[in-house]
């Protein structure tokens, strides 16, 4: 929305930077729509995008890599003005550049210096000045402080806040640091594997997150107030490939609140453990040959049953005895199938034994509260999921 800061947060590789660059048409959108003040930007050529380039600018994550080392700072800041016919002549543009440098905390005399002559924080200030040179309405800031020292980060964040108020900017702030989000943003959008899973006002999201992924991210934020601290939610497993994401809910392979099937008689934690075993079998993470080699080194000889027992020990969080009796047999069967080299049969066994609506169906985006959205079966009234998590 006009004049607000929307933060986009998520783990590295989830698509935050690609999203920001796609909004500016630096990457072509493969699906969906990108609109700016009601105008459709998807599919526009570079020539057609030119009027929008002046209104939409970007601050990059690596300040030095985004600045031409062969150009002076004056040339870097005045180049966008020249492209968009801002300023009466070269002298006027240089004066504007000097004023911008002073506004971002540098000196007018710095126009004659080169980017390599500045510190990281100063280089980022040059990047901010360049983005402001064309008087944009929207700035996409792609992790603008992640490459800087903590003390310098605070200075750049404060500068962006001041400039936003002064120039009436809208800011899309991309970051993986939730402590930064709390400081600069009005609203936040949480991204996982290329999809927005939750949005809402920052204060409400921090106080009462809806999506399990958001809860896990917030549990990792250090808190000075002991009463505000909470138990860390550790996500098991690795992040799937965004090229081949899981079916259903993309978070189900790591979700601590994955929904059991109706026939499940154990606890949520027990199902999470059984489901983790299922995921590891499906992903081919069980290595019977390595286990067999180790057992032979330890015992001198081994058999498939012993290998299967060790596979269960390695791949199942907790103890097999903690699961309902009906769950132990398919786990033993799957482990024996893996030990015998029948990985496809093992995958079918665990898929049949431990189904979940989180796998069968992608969650729809619902509004659990005013100004809030979440894409999770647990907050969808159409799903009768026990909110134990």
Name these PLM-found stretches.
Residues 134, 141, 158:
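Conserved signature/switch motifs of ABC ATPase nucleotide-binding domains
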């Amino acid at each position: 929305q006009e004049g607000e800061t929307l933060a986009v947060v998520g783990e590295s590789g989830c698509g935050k930077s690609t999203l920001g660059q796609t909004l500016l048409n630096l990457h072509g959108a493969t699906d969906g729509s990108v609109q700016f003040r009601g105008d459709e930007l998807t599919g526009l050529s570079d020539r057609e995008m030119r009027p929008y380039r002046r209104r939409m600018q970007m601050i990059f994550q690596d300040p030095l890599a985004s600045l031409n080392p062969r150009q002076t700072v004056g040339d870097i800041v005045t180049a966008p003005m020249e492209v968009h016919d801002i300023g009466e002549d070269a002298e006027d543009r240089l004066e504007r550049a000097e004023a911008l440098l002073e506004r971002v905390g540098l000196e007018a005399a710095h126009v004659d210096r080169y980017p390599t002559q500045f510190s990281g924080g100063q280089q980022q200030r040059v990047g901010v000045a360049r983005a402001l040179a064309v008087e944009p309405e929207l700035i996409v800031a792609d992790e603008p402080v992640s490459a800087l020292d903590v003390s310098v980060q605070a200075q750049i964040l404060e500068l962006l806040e001041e400039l936003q108020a002064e120039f009436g900017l809208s800011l899309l702030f991309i970051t993986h640091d939730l402590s930064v989000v709390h400081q600069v943003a009005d609203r936040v959008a949480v991204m996982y594997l290329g999809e927005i899973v939750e949005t809402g006002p920052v204060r409400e999201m921090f106080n009462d997150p809806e999506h399990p992924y958001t809860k896990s991210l917030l549990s990792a934020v250090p808190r000075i107030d002991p009463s505000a601290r909470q138990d860390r939610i550790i996500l098991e497993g690795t992040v799937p490939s965004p090229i081949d994401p899981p079916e259903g809910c993309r978070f189900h392979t790591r979700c601590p609140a994955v929904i059991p099937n109706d026939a499940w008689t154990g606890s949520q934690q027990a199902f999470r453990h059984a489901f983790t075993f299922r995921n590891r079998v499906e992903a081919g993470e069980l290595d019977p040959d390595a286990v067999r080699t180790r057992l032979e080194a330890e015992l001198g000889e081994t058999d498939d049953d012993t290998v299967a027992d060790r596979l269960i020990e390695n791949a199942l969080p907790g103890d097999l005895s903690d699961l309902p009796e009906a769950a132990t047999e398919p786990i033993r069967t799957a482990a024996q199938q893996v030990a015998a080299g029948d990985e496809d049969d093992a995958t079918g066994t665990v898929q049949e034994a431990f189904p979940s609506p989180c796998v069968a169906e992608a969650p729809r985006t619902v509004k659990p509260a005013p100004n809030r959205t979440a894409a999770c079966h647990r907050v969808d009234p159409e799903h009768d999921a026990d909110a134990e998590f």
